[in-house]
A protein has these predicted regions:
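Bacterial Sec-dependent N-terminal signal peptides
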Residues: 1-24
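Generic structural motif
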Residues: 4, 12-15, 116-118, 146-148
Length: 160
């Protein structure tokens, strides 16, 4: 009887520990009338930001970045010539936010954006959306919270 209870307790503890581990990397869902975001915690592992210190962005960080997107997006360098169309449909893009600190101490948000109606995007609140191609349905940009500046716009290539 004691062995059965002990085995049951160990099993329950391992399941609970596993659930906590999964929860520690799941994103927070932050939705407003203007944007729909996943905020990933610093515990989420990603290869996008190498050799940097991670942080979990807060709602004020996201609001500040979204304000910059609305104000500064059209000023970005765009070799694809699709930025005006992207900008016109900003509300239709979901965002994933990842925070990191650069070696010179700047707090930066990596913003992954994708078309909300894309049937191929699943589990966007649990894992980073990564695709090859897809055109302007997929893009990323960085926002420097320290300098209040957007940079490094990347719009995916079309599938050919």
């Amino acid at each position: 009887m004691k062995k059965t209870v002990l085995v049951a307790l160990i099993f329950i503890a391992s399941v609970a520990a596993n659930a906590q581990l999964k929860d520690s990397t799941a994103a927070w869902h932050y939705k407003t009338d203007s944007y729909d975001c996943a905020i990933f915690p610093m515990a989420y592992s990603t290869d996008i930001v190498h050799n940097t210190k991670r942080f979990t962005p807060g709602f004020p960080d996201i609001d500040k970045a979204e304000h910059a997107i609305a104000q500064q997006m059209l000023q970005q360098r765009d070799t694809t010539k699709r930025l005006p169309d992207v900008y016109r449909h900003l509300k239709k893009y979901r965002r994933q936010y990842f925070g990191y600190t650069t070696t010179d101490g700047h707090r930066v948000l990596y913003i992954n954006m994708f078309w909300e109606e894309d049937k191929y995007v699943k589990d966007w609140l649990k894992q980073m959306v990564m695709v090859q191609g897809g055109g302007s349905n997929y893009l990323s940009i960085k926002y420097d919270l320290t300098d209040n500046r957007l940079y490094d716009l990347q719009i995916n290539a079309d599938n050919n």
